[in-house]
Amino acid sequence: MESPQIRVAMLCGNGRSSRILYNSLATLPGVHITRVIVENSPSALALLRGRVRKLGTARVAGQLLFMAYNRLLSRASAQRIQQLMKGYGISDAPFPTANLHQVDSINNPGTIGLLAAARPDAVIVNGTRIIAASILSAIACPVINTHMGITPRYRGVHGGYWALARGDRENCGVTVHLVDPGIDTGGVLYQDTIHPDSRDNFNTYPIHQLAKAIPLIMAALDDVRRQQIQVRPGVLPSMLWSHPTLFEYLGNRIRHGAK
């Protein structure tokens, strides 16, 4: 007997990773994406002010220097990214307009109504700000996130990079986990590792991670379909990571080859 189709809604940003996930899930048999809710990018100034409050001016200045450098690195990585995407058979084509809704913030009260109308069996999250507890509590089905790192050791951003930067290659990977109000603190469903080579860098690690994540998401959706979700232990200790500063990046590249 054929498995029943699972209804999926997505809460995501409009970045490459979200588009890759959409295009990969949309082609899977037994998956019906009923709605895609895309969050507009937050104000750069608001993000900057928030970082300064949390991290201090000096660290944020170092991060901005790295981000400027990474623009150049990103351009130099374009060919490798396309090569990897072709090899993995994944696409970052734009979202189709059918069932696409844009919101200023995923935490707008209107998000609840959009999700309720979509009647999902599961909600897949990618590339959004932290989802408010008021939104999560109003969602009646499992909410599942793809995190670019092994949790809870590499919560926050650029988890794969930070594992390599610390010489922790066996924990350079990706996690599919349930979403709670914390920062990547939800229960782990599935994890897997990646093995980048000398051609890879800060901008190509996520392509490897996304390719590994897709079968993990499918496994999680199968668990939802069967009502057999099982939380697994993650990798400790729990640590929260942010963007590297330029000097951290250069030091990590020299010490551990993390590019």
What are the functions of these language-model segments?
Residues 1-259:
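One-carbon transfer enzymes
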